[in-house]
Every structure is written in C-alpha cells, then in structure tokens.
C-alpha cells in the first residue's frame, strides 16, 4: 500500500507512518526522513521489530548516522536500530559503441591501485551517444554494515572520519 503525503489535510510523513505502523506491516518504506518526528517514529518502530527502509539526503553512508543524530535521535537508539546504511551515486557509462583504451600514467595506476593488466577506457563520441562518449548511467553504491564496533563508536559519538577509517580498515 502506498500512502500519499498531503500537508493540506495534515497527512505528514509522521502521521502516515503512525497510521501504517498500527497495521503491523512486515516492511515499511518511508519515502524520506525529513524531520525529527519522522526519524523518532521510524527508529522506535525498528526497535519493536519493524523492518524500516528509508532515504536521507547525505553525501555518503556514514552521513546517514550523523544526519539522524542531528535530527535529535540519541546515539544509543541509532546503534540499537540501524543495521546498514548505504549511499549511491549515478555515474555516466562509457558508450560501448565508441569506447577505446586509454593510457593511464603509472603514478596514477599506483594511486588508484590498478593492476598493470587493467584496461581503462574512454568514449571518443559517436552518433549512438550524441558525440558525448557516454550512454546511460550506472549506480555506484557504498554500503556500511554496522558491526558491534561501529555501533559502539556511534554510542561514543565518534566522528564520521573515525567511523570511516575503521570501516575502510575492517569492513571490506
């Protein structure tokens, strides 16, 4: 079931979420957590066993934790209710009809961790892609699974940088 939000009749994200949760659904998708009231309801619902999915405007997966904390959600509630956060970017795809190999300088290969056999392409432009070299988009995802250490870091109010450093080192 999908419920439209209509502020003219006082049907906000928060009031719609309350109504949905009274029906004890297996999964709830909240279009976007925009305010403290909706965040609080979603977090408390997840603590009672509801599976809640939602979106937030952040730059990366760790930013979701900070965003919810900035909305007033207590760190112990975040660490108890969050299982995973993710972020996505849509990147342009190189046109398959006009792609051609491109040389990558050795210093850049090393910096990017590219194997010497890895072929890097660029699109030269053709009729199929409107001479842009690109055709379509592809999602690039960043996923943060919250293990016990990350949850402990949240409770201790660790910075985004500290959580990111831990995740890069331990959660690959």
Whereabouts are the PLM-identified features?
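Short, flexible helix-loop junctions that flank or precede catalytic/ligand sites
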Residues: 1-172
């Amino acid at each position: 079931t999908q419920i439209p939000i209509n502020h003219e009749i006082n049907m906000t994200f928060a009031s719609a979420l309350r109504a949905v949760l009274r029906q004890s659904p297996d999964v709830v998708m909240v279009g976007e957590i925009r305010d403290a009231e909706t965040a609080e309801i979603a977090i408390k619902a997840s603590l009672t066993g509801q599976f809640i999915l939602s979106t937030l405007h952040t730059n990366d997966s760790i930013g979701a934790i900070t965003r919810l904390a900035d909305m007033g959600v207590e760190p112990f509630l975040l660490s108890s209710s969050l299982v995973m956060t993710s972020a996505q970017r849509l990147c342009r795809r190189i046109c398959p009809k006009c792609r051609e190999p491109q040389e990558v300088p050795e210093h850049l290969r090393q910096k990017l961790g590219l194997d010497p056999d890895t072929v890097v392409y660029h699109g030269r432009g053709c009729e199929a892609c409107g001479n842009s070299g690109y055709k379509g988009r592809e999602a690039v995802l960043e996923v943060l699974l919250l293990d016990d250490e990350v949850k402990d870091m949240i409770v201790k109010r660790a910075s985004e940088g500290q959580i990111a450093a831990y995740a890069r080192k331990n959660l690959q």
